[in-house]
């Protein structure tokens, strides 16, 4: 069962997922998944381990092939594009950070690869330097990326994705390895970046409270393949309790909603 988005013309920059299905062999992970991620806002995919959140992200990114359904951006079939064409539209930050022994600067410069042929242009270098500065990691430029901690590496990979200048940014648990201060700083940056640049951000998260703070919409999953999309400010105790299989209570403090789990 899936909540169907409303019919009608979609705003520019909308990532549209329709009737998506995926299976490992004979085991259907989920089917008939429908939701939208809108330009200028952040949407979170929530749920317990094993519900297919990362698999859903990989299907949208074109890494895995869905059994059925479509992924479109401004009417274009994302899954039918070449890898280079897709990289100009969608940037993906995976859950695990892996890097060769190259500088942080050169790692971020790889985000410009879809745009240059033989070598980078002055504009490519300018974008890299601006991105490093905006994320507060310009001082890391000459560091060996392979020596970074997990949290530092995630910030560098986020910088590389932003340097791609995508229309859609996919983030798989972008704050999993970050300390509290870096987590807050990164999420606020992502929200501001989405709004400023008109990018649709879709992220997998295990942090419900963080999702409630920065996201406009939530995509809720469960082990039985049930997926629904709901506005973050309209999600209910019952919906979150069903998603996580535990009693969840929503509370408000200083105009911020947060969850308490358990009876």
Describe these PLM feature segments.
Residues 15, 29-32:
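Conserved structural motif at the start of ABC-family nucleotide-binding domains
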Residues 46-48:
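The feature captures the beta-strand-to-loop junction immediately N-terminal to the Walker
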Residues 169-173:
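Catalytic Walker B motif of ABC-type/P-loop ATPase nucleotide-binding domains
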Residues 61:
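Helix-to-loop junction immediately C-terminal to a conserved catalytic motif
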Residues 144-148, 152:
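Conserved ABC ATPase signature
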């Amino acid at each position: 069962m899936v909540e169907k988005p409303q019919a009608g013309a979609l705003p520019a920059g909308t990532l549209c997922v329709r009737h998506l299905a995926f299976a490992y062999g004979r085991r259907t992970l989920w089917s008939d998944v429908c939701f939208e991620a809108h330009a200028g806002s952040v949407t979170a995919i929530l749920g317990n381990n094993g519900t297919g959140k990362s698999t859903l992200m990989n299907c949208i990114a074109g890494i895995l092939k869905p059994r059925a359904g479509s992924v479109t951006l401004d009417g274009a079939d994302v899954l039918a594009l070449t890898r280079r064409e897709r990289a100009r539209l969608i940037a993906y930050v995976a859950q695990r950070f892996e890097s060769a022994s190259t500088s942080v600067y050169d790692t971020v410069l790889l985000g410009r690869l879809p745009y240059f042929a033989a070598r980078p242009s002055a504009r490519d270098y300018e974008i890299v330097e601006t991105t490093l500065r905006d994320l507060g990691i310009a001082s890391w430029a000459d560091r060996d990326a392979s020596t970074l901690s997990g949290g530092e590496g995630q910030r560098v990979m986020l910088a590389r994705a932003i340097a791609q200048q995508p229309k859609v940014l996919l983030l798989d648990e972008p704050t999993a390895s970050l300390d509290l201060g870096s987590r807050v700083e990164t999420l606020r940056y992502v929200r501001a970046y989405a709004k400023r640049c008109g990018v649709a951000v879709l992220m997998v998260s295990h942090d419900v409270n963080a999702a409630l703070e920065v996201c406009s919409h939530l995509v809720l999953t469960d082990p039985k393949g049930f997926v629904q999309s709901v506005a973050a400010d309209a999600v209910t105790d019952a919906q979150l309790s069903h998603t996580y299989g535990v009693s969840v209570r929503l509370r408000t403090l200083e105009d911020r909603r947060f969850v308490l789990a358990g009876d």
